Amino acid sequence: MILQRLFRLSSAVQSAISVSWRRNIGITAVAFNKELDPVQKLFVDKIREYRTKRQTSGGPVDAGPEYQQDLDRELFKLKQMYGKADMNTFPNFTFEDPKFEVVEKPQS
């Protein structure tokens, strides 16, 4: 009886470990594969270049003054339509509980 439980437990642990190993081996195989094809290498290089541009500019990349003017114009329209609130924050709602009248039940 004890041996059967032990074998069941060991098989469950063994299957969990094997699944974990398969996942880890799959991840590390991709991480250690430094040989990229030329298209993949260009794609990764462009992503890195974009990230550095975005960090240095602190905003949209390759956006001219037209973009900033359009953004300001659209934010102004939204403020006009929905009030003078800050558009970058979620609105704060306040709800009041309704007041109910207490109605006496007629006795029959």
Swiss-Prot record:
Give the GO terms filed under biological process for this record: proton motive force-driven ATP synthesis
Presequence boundaries: 1-32
Phosphoserine modified-residue sites: S108
**Recorded GO terms, molecular function?**
proton transmembrane transporter activity
Provide the primary localization: mitochondrion
Localization per record: Mitochondrion; Mitochondrion inner membrane
Give the sites modified to N6-succinyllysine: K84, K99
- Where are residues bearing N6-acetyllysine located in the sequence? K41, K46, K79, K84, K99, K105
Q: Which GO terms describe its cellular component?
A: mitochondrial inner membrane; mitochondrion; proton-transporting ATP synthase complex
Q: Where is the signal peptide?
A: none
> Which keywords describe this protein according to UniProt?
Acetylation, CF(0), Hydrogen ion transport, Ion transport, Membrane, Mitochondrion, Mitochondrion inner membrane, Phosphoprotein, Transit peptide, Transport
What InterPro entries does the annotation carry?
ATP_synth_f6_mt, ATP_synth_f6_sf_mt
Its subunit composition reads: Component of the ATP synthase complex composed at least of ATP5F1A/subunit alpha, ATP5F1B/subunit beta, ATP5MC1/subunit c (homooctomer), MT-ATP6/subunit a, MT-ATP8/subunit 8, ATP5ME/subunit e, ATP5MF/subunit f, ATP5MG/subunit g, ATP5MK/subunit k, ATP5MJ/subunit j, ATP5F1C/subunit gamma, ATP5F1D/subunit delta, ATP5F1E/subunit epsilon, ATP5PF/subunit F6, ATP5PB/subunit b, ATP5PD/subunit d, ATP5PO/subunit OSCP.
- Similarity remark: Belongs to the eukaryotic ATPase subunit F6 family.
Q: What does this protein do?
A: Subunit F6, of the mitochondrial membrane ATP synthase complex (F(1)F(0) ATP synthase or Complex V) that produces ATP from ADP in the presence of a proton gradient across the membrane which is generated by electron transport complexes of the respiratory chain. ATP synthase complex consist of a soluble F(1) head domain - the catalytic core - and a membrane F(1) domain - the membrane proton channel. These two domains are linked by a central stalk rotating inside the F(1) region and a stationary peripheral stalk.
Q: What name has this protein been given in UniProt? A: ATP synthase peripheral stalk subunit F6, mitochondrial
